[in-house]
């Protein structure tokens, strides 16, 4: 009976706060006309998918029809699913995805025990990370009475264990057995267990599976830490954890023993005390029975606190030790591998050039395309910038940050290998009159939100506090779906746990994006990145470079001051890029301009931090402060007269290049 009473409050909390983590149908990419050839092919292959999956040991990958109306499809169930359950899940998912995505060429869904995906392009064997969806319970873990520090430790251990088990697993030959699946459990308390399930599509590599799962866990942690459960779904992988078993995935899992209890009390003496002392002894016994457990608990908490602090201290030391990147063997490529990928650094593969070297497009023997940043042997700052970027970016995992795949350090060769981002950089579209039309308001608004989430990760949600110091349009890459990825961490700096700002005499960055306190005094902080973000938002909305306003008149105007004048005159929407037309929400655009003006306030204390910015962008009910006049920037010449060593960063690219932002050039003014 005690067991039932102890479990009941937690169970009731789930009934009250559960926000379903059942995966939604994700529709994306292009459109097709109803009853077109593609639509008929899609319906046909979806109608037979359930029987094909059950007859192919739980995984079916096929195509149907002729190009350009060919449909590619995946269907799979979790290992151990009964054939009838698998069939029902696939059929239900196929029907739901067909209804929810009536005219989209690409879609996928991950219900509890199966997955369905279709597309008009082949995706077999390819790691596909986006679009993704994060779901979570609305209840907080602290509502269950669980200590959050203890929970975090157990949760992280469970996630790492499940990632390892899933990415290294292979088919065991059992019914519907598949590789890249794991279901693990961990005891949170005597009466409470955590359940984690992860799965990748079996057509990707083990390394890609591990990356997909780690990224998903990182995304959940950034979004929903402290919640009572949740899931992250991607086209190539699925992560879910909860405080109760689900999907029938844990029937054969061995449950771990409960966490150790308090130390036992000392044995009671069997020799009876004298009769005259029995009353006193009884009182003493009661006191001992109460005090000893309290002391044990307090000592345990103190030990736990000390261990946690030592652990944090150790992690900080370990991070600084990684400055010697030759120890990072898991990320290292051989020079021969890079040469082969780029056809010996052929000019035809060069996609960018700058003061620190060149950027090449390459293709690894394992399949994926990469962007290879080869630092110049004669660059005086090359080694330091290389170390900085390699150490920083290798630790960053977020969908709005460019992904570092590895590096090469052999002799004088210093090379960084990044994921290949096909749609060039934001400035390529934003400032080209012929390309601006491709950025409608919806895309621009999504780009603003994605950049904000990427900066939030750098400032708060990653294990390091990182100040980018060079946020600008040419350092924002756009993937195939025009999602933004922050790039170029050559100037980034790590802050300590309690550090809020730092100073430098060498001002490095891009004029126009620098905050006044950084440009004039060398002070940089999270608020200086916020200033750069504000300028970037104004550029995205207007389609104009901040620098394009210089020398127009003698007023010293720039985009920031121009936006402020329009705001003050009650006509902020005059800032909106005319190529957008009328297809935007005026309230949404006005709100974004308002947020940008708050970000470029002269006093750093008046600028919002990223959590507040995200809230402002996503909630129309959040009240915004009235902006004051923004900070005014001096020219580079003025800075030199003030005795500040000033270095501006610019980007140069080969005409027709794929990736303008992969290299940054620095030169003295």
From Swiss-Prot:
Residues 345-624 form the Protein kinase domain. ATP binds at residues 351-359, 373. One of its GO terms (biological process) is defense response to bacterium. Residues 24-285 are extracellular. GO terms for cellular component: plasma membrane. The chain crosses the membrane at residues 286-306. Glycans are attached at residues 35, 52, 103, 120, 147, 172, 252, 280. This is Cysteine-rich receptor-like protein kinase 34.
């Amino acid at each position: 009976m005690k067991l039932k009473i102890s479990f009941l409050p937690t169970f009731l909390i789930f009934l009250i706060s559960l926000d379903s983590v059942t995966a939604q149908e994700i529709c994306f990419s292009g459109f097709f006309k109803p009853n077109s050839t593609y639509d008929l092919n899609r319906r046909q292959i979806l109608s037979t998918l359930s029987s094909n999956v059950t007859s192919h040991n739980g995984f079916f990958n096929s195509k149907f029809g002729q190009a350009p109306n060919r449909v590619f499809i995946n269907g799979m169930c979790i290992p151990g699913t009964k054939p009838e359950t698998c069939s029902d899940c696939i059929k239900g998912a196929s029907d739901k995805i067909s209804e929810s995505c009536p005219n989209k060429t690409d879609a996928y869904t991950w219900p509890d025990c199966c997955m369905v995906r279709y597309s008009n392009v082949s995706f077999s064997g390819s790691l596909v990370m986006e679009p993704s969806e994060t779901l979570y319970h609305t209840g907080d873990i602290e509502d269950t009475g669980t200590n959050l520090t203890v929970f975090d430790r157990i949760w992280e251990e469970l996630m790492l264990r499940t990632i390892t088990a899933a990415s290294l697993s292979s088919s065991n030959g059992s019914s519907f057995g598949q590789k890249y699946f794991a279901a693990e459990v961990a005891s949170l308390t005597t009466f409470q267990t955590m359940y984690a399930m992860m799965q990748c599509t079996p057509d990707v590599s083990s390394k890609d599976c591990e990356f997909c799962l780690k990224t998903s866990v990182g995304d959940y942690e950034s979004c929903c830490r402290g919640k009572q459960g949740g899931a992250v779904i991607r086209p190539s992988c699925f992560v879910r954890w909860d405080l109760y078993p689900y999907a029938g995935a844990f029937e054969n899992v061995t449950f771990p023993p409960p966490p150790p209890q308090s130390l036992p009390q000392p044995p009671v003496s069997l020799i009876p005390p004298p009769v005259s002392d029995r009353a006193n002894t009884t009182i003493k016994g009661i006191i001992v029975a109460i005090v000893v457990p309290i002391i044990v608990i307090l000592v345990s908490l103190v030990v736990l606190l000390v261990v946690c602090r030592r652990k944090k201290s150790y992690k900080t030391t370990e991070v600084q030790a990684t400055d010697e990147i030759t120890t990072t063997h898991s990320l290292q490529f051989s020079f021969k591998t890079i040469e082969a990928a780029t056809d010996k650094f052929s000019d035809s593969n060069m996609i960018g050039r700058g003061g620190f070297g060149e950027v090449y497009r390459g293709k690894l023997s394992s399949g994926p395309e990469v962007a290879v940043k080869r630092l110049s042997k004669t660059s005086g700052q090359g080694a330091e910038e290389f170390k900085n970027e390699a150490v920083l970016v290798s630790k960053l995992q977020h969908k709005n940050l460019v992904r570092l795949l590895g590096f090469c350090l052999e002799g004088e060769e210093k090379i960084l290998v990044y994921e290949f981002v096909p749609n060039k950089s934001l400035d390529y579209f934003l400032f080209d009159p012929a390309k601006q039309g491709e950025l409608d308001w919806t895309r621009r608004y999504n780009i603003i939100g994605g950049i904000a989430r990427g900066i939030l990760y750098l400032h708060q949600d990653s294990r390091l506090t990182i100040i980018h110091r060079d946020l600008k349009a040419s350092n924002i890459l756009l993937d195939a779906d025009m999602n933004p990825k922050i790039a170029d961490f050559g100037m980034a700096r790590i802050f300590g746990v309690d550090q809020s700002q730092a100073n430098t005499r060498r001002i490095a960055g891009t004029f126009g994006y620098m905050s006044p306190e950084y440009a004039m005094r060398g002070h940089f902080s999270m608020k200086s990145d916020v200033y750069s973000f504000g300028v970037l938002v104004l550029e995205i909305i207007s389609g104009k470079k901040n620098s394009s306003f210089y020398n127009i008149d003698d007023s010293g105007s720039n985009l920031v001051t121009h936006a402020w004048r329009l705001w003050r005159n009650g006509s902020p929407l005059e800032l909106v890029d005319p190529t957008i037309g009328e297809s935007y929400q005026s309230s949404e655009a006005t709100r974004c301009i308002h947020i940008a003006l708050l970000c470029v306030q002269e006093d750093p204390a008046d600028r919002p931090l990223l959590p507040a910015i995200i809230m402002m962008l996503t909630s129309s009910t959040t009240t915004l402060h009235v902006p004051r006049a923004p900070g005014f920037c001096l020219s580079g010449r003025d800075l030199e007269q003030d005795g500040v060593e000033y270095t501006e960063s610019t980007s140069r690219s080969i005409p027709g290049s794929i990736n303008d932002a992969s290299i940054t050039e620095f030169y003295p003014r």
